[in-house]
């Protein structure tokens, strides 16, 4: 049977870097919220013993694609626990709407959707907590997509506390550049010593992203986009970019600004949601 699963985008409503670890990773405080917009995965399980990606990405070998890596990891863990036969296989395809290097979590969301969906379809019986631990091996943002609730995150982003920020409307714009996360985190000018604060203080303060200054300095396209959006609404970078979002109370207000966007800029309008569309789909299975 062929099933279809959402792989939603996320926004970092704020992102603060509170330190750098000896292993090079950074300690963060960030607020994740999902969007009702993203990629779509189509999954067909079978008894072929093979995992096939029917929609390869240009320049990304299948074995490096997070979709295949997630499927292999789940299969290995399930077979280690004797909850899956050796001939378990699947055909997987993704319809991409989220840009690579956009700060929307597209690859991590794809991986999380594979873990959650195949755990259900293969009936491997892992808990969301176990799946999130597997996901952390694939990327720091994978656990929040697996757990499926808007969250305040600490550590490298893996320690999650459920929160319920307002479900606002967002205009998300892409400046036409792709930004690799290591480029930003290795920048010598990046702020790495923002004081750690309690969640109550963070939620009552103005939201910021510590990566934004570095990205705006390095990428003229991002600087111009943020400056333009700030004329209309509170706006900032998500993740390490490149996407920038502006927040609105209504869809119509977001659409009015979108219609004024300079020619050639790509973007979309979506609502923030505190329960992932992936988990809404899972609950309907």
From Swiss-Prot:
Catalytic reaction annotation: 4-CDP-2-C-methyl-D-erythritol + ATP = 4-CDP-2-C-methyl-D-erythritol 2-phosphate + ADP + H(+)
InterPro entries assigned: GHMP_kinase_C_dom (IPR013750), GHMP_kinase_C_sf (IPR036554), GHMP_kinase_N_dom (IPR006204), IspE (IPR004424), Ribosomal_Su5_D2-typ_SF (IPR020568), Ribsml_uS5_D2-typ_fold_subgr (IPR014721)
GO terms for MF: 4-(cytidine 5'-diphospho)-2-C-methyl-D-erythritol kinase activity; ATP binding
GO biological process: isopentenyl diphosphate biosynthetic process, methylerythritol 4-phosphate pathway; terpenoid biosynthetic process
Catalytic-site annotation from UniProt: 10, 141
Function: Catalyzes the phosphorylation of the position 2 hydroxy group of 4-diphosphocytidyl-2C-methyl-D-erythritol.
Subunit organization: Homodimer.
Name of the protein: 4-diphosphocytidyl-2-C-methyl-D-erythritol kinase
């Amino acid at each position: 049977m062929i099933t279809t699963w959402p792989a939603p985008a996320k926004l970092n409503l704020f992102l603060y870097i509170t330190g750098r670890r000896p292993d090079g990773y950074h300690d963060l405080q960030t607020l994740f919220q999902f969007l009702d917009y993203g990629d779509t995965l189509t999954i067909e399980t079978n008894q072929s013993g093979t995992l096939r990606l029917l929609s390869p990405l240009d320049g990304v070998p299948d074995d490096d694609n997070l979709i295949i890596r997630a499927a292999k990891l789940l299969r290995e863990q399930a077979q280690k626990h004797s909850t899956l036969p050796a001939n378990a296989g699947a055909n997987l395809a993704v319809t991409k709407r989220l840009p690579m290097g956009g700060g929307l979590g597209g690859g991590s969301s794809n991986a999380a959707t594979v873990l959650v969906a195949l755990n259900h379809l293969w009936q491997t019986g892992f808990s969301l907590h176990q799946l999130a631990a597997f996901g952390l091996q694939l990327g720091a943002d994978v656990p929040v997509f697996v757990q499926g609730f808007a969250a305040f995150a600490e550590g490298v982003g893996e320690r999650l506390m459920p929160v319920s920020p307002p479900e606002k409307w967002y205009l998300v714009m892409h400046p036409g550049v792709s930004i690799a996360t290591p480029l930003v985190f290795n920048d010598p000018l990046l702020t790495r010593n923002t004081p750690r604060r309690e969640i109550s203080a963070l939620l009552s303060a103005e939201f910021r992203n510590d990566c934004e200054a570095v990205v705006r300095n390095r990428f003229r396209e991002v600087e111009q986009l943020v400056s333009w959006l700030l004329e209309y609404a509170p706006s900032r970078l998500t993740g390490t970019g490149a996407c920038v979002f502006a927040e609105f109370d209504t869809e119509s207000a977001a659409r009015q600004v979108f219609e004024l966007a300079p020619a050639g800029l790509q973007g979309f309008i979506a609502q923030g949601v505190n329960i992932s569309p992936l988990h809404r789909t899972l609950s309907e299975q």
